[in-house]
Amino acid sequence: MIRGMKDSTMPIIASLRGKAAKVVADIVASTSFPSIMKIIEPQSYLDFGYITANACGIITDSGNVAEEATFNQVPCITLNSYTEHIETVKVGTNVLVGEDPDSLSIALEDMVNGTWKKAGIPDRWDGRSAERILQILSC
């Protein structure tokens, strides 16, 4: 998958820990991959929320991160062939690329060039859940 990111001109922040961080760092060090990748420790909820809301795009294997990306209208590439949050693909900003480096490279090009798919916010993702819950409870 790192091969699929090798031509990126955007800085890449990888929130990894332990063995995953070491494996990725070793792979990056053993290739001609530009030094645009920065590996950081996993962040607090608020810090991670800030990073994801202000990112040019997100690459993840997490359905929950894809949800955050859709809510913030940030392009998201999921390194999987399925998601438990299909609305992020059908309505939102998420695209599934599986484990194919070429598909990742094409999606990254769209992300960086600003040609990402048009997306919306899925039904009931309007931030008004508390109001709806109170309305149901008061009946």
Sequence positions of predicted segments:
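Nucleotide-activated sugar donor-binding and catalytic core shared by glycosyltransferases
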Residues: M1-C139
